[in-house]
Amino acid sequence: MLAGGEKMEIFNSRNIPNLKEEEIIVPLFTLDTFLLPEDQMMMRVFEPRYKQMLDDIVLDGLPYGHVISNPSMPELNGVSVPYDVGVLVEIDQFQEQGSNLLYLANGGERFRINSLIEPALKPEFFNSIFPSVDELVEEYVEEFPEGKLYVRGIIELIPDLTGEIDTKRWDYLLSLWKSYIEIIAQINEMDVTDLDIDNEVNNMFPIPEIKSLWKLAALILDSVEAQTLSLKAENVEEVCSLIESNIQKKISTVRLFRQSNE
């Protein structure tokens, strides 16, 4: 079975293919926004399918894949099909709070999804009272003994970005970001100076390195298109260009807003 027009095969837990040398299987957490490398996100889990996912990986310190749903694709056994890229997530500050599981998601390596493994059960709407994971497992374990409540992906890692960050290019990107922050501060009549903004940005991004590039991208790339392109990027310049064009758009938008309110 193929996922829509994408060349992404879909399997169930009884017909998982032999993996290629570079492939691994990871749980997929499908959300409505991407997490980029070096970015962080506080998570609250209450659905049984994702509680099962965390049970499967937390004790062994394994990652899962953070992906975003693709609205142009048909659902997979009641679950949204994701775009074909994502990031591996390492879990930190894991804790239970009542019936919820809380943790800090840390964005790591990028990956591409080659195939999907569908969940053993179609998700149901349970209002505010959820059944236990064990109760749901009992519904499918005889037919799909290796099944899971969540979608899994057969993935391969995307290589690190190639190239070096040019210092002048980096300084220009930071200057654009500072200009944007200055305009926002003026619109909101915030009591900050250009020096305050300059120091804050320089402290956040002290040196032009790949980690800093991804952190800057996480602040600026807020559209699905830009985030997807960054996750598929092969070299540093591609990400720099995405950052530059998106800051320019933001600056143009807030300038128009300010002019319309003068």
Language-model features: locations:
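N-terminal low-complexity, acidic/polar interaction/targeting segments
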Residues: 2-262
